[in-house]
Amino acid sequence: MMRKLAILSVSSFLFVEALFQEYQCYGSSSNTRVLNELNYDNAGTNLYNELEMNYYGKQENWYSLKKNSRSLGENDDGNNEDNEKLRKPKHKKLKQPADGNPDPNANPNVDPNANPNVDPNANPNVDPNANPNANPNANPNANPNANPNANPNANPNANPNANPNANPNANPNANPNANPNANPNANPNANPNANPNVDPNANPNANPNANPNANPNANPNANPNANPNANPNANPNANPNANPNANPNANPNANPNANPNANPNANPNANPNKNNQGNGQGHNMPNDPNRNVDENANANSAVKNNNNEEPSDKHIKEYLNKIQNSLSTEWSPCSVTCGNGIQVRIKPGSANKPKDELDYANDIEKKICKMEKCSSVFNVVNSSIGLIMVLSFLFLN
């Protein structure tokens, strides 16, 4: 056994090495590239060191030359002439004469305290107290006695003949065409729209409480003998969709086994009158989306009949309880994966009934489904052992 394992390991190693030979060239190429990079870095370092040594050598030579020039007494600042040429020339600004040296061309009569900003063409006789902002276009003939407090908003078109004693509280909106002989005791609140043609003989005792909402168009043909007991809420269209099969017990002689495809081998001991065995609290809609639940899982978890016998009423009831949410007018999957099982569906005539009101005997159709015979535990174990042996043989040989 160990010998076979050793041979298998060596052969696997050789096989892998032969299979992946093409990657070896890439590895050597990578090593060569890394080596070249190292050489390049070394070359760059050497070049940098050489340049640095040359720089320091030049500096030492310059310091040595400067030292020798000083010892010989030479002007080591001889290069300053070039620096002077590069400097910008300084421009000499004009200087103002000092206070002790007055300008010989200055006016000897100028007031030393005079305003330097005075207009030279100004009138020398101007009133020093005059308003500097006076209107140059002012009227020279203005009344010197004019009221300085006059109303600037006064009406310039006022009537010069107006009565100076006029009532200040007079109505400015008075009607100029009003009757000057009007009765001063007249009622100021009289209705100007009063009807001048009112009947003087009108009944002063008219009923002030008359119904203003009386219907002037009352129907004179109304039926005074209408039936007081008529049902005002009667619905003539009560249920247009009434289910003619609503009463499952309508026909006492109904044949619950009317299905022409019924299994002639049905259990003769089944109780067809046992009601409400398959009733549940499922959804009411026949096209319930939950009908798409994993029916295969339900089928796999259903009762298995290892003896290949026909299912009993107990098995049928358990299966109906498991698939009550997915019941429809289509046949359900077989209740078992091997052996004999059951398939159920809702009768087409009972499709509109709620699922919790379905009758086990009258609303549910049943039929037997036969699957392959169930394998025993011994067969399963033997199959597993055989598979393991085959795999071991393939990998070890």
From Swiss-Prot:
UniProt region (43 X 4 AA tandem repeats of N-[PVA]-[DN]-P), positions on chain: 101-272
Region (Region I) residue spans: 93-97
Lipidation (GPI-anchor amidated cysteine): C374
Bias-annotated ranges (Polar residues): 274-290
UniProt xrefs under Gene3D superfamilies: Thrombospondin type-1 (TSP1) repeat
Record keywords: Cell membrane, Cytoplasm, Disulfide bond, Glycoprotein, GPI-anchor, Lipoprotein, Malaria, Membrane, Repeat, Signal, Sporozoite
Function: Essential sporozoite protein. In the mosquito vector, required for sporozoite development in the oocyst, migration through the vector hemolymph and entry into the vector salivary glands. In the vertebrate host, required for sporozoite migration through the host dermis and infection of host hepatocytes. Binds to highly sulfated heparan sulfate proteoglycans (HSPGs) on the surface of host hepatocytes.
Name of the protein in question: Circumsporozoite protein
Gene behind the chain: CSP
